[in-house]
Amino acid sequence: MARILRGEIRWADLNPVRGKEQAGNRPVLILSHDVFNERSGTVIAVALTSHPQRAAFPLTLELQSGDLPKKSWVKISQIRTLSIERIGSRVGRALPEEVAQIVDGFNEIIGT
């Protein structure tokens, strides 16, 4: 498999899930650094959705990246550690400013 890089949007198999976790085969945005992804065999990612979101930042962020096939929102509260075995092909890439804003949103949610 090609290297999995921070800021990439890739397909991922999120099943099995519990409760209100995002399910299914869906795009995720990779937040973890490249070296972590390569050495750990896992990635830290957040789920994306194409359904318009009522919740605002810091819970969600609309992506402005032009290379996605659909308008998409990052569900910042839906962060997961995933085995690289769950990660599929590349869909697109988030702008570096978007990745930074998502990390800021996550920090706001957890209270740092």
Model-inferred region functions:
Residues M1-T112:
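Conserved functional hotspots at enzyme active or ligand-binding sites that engage polyanionic ligands
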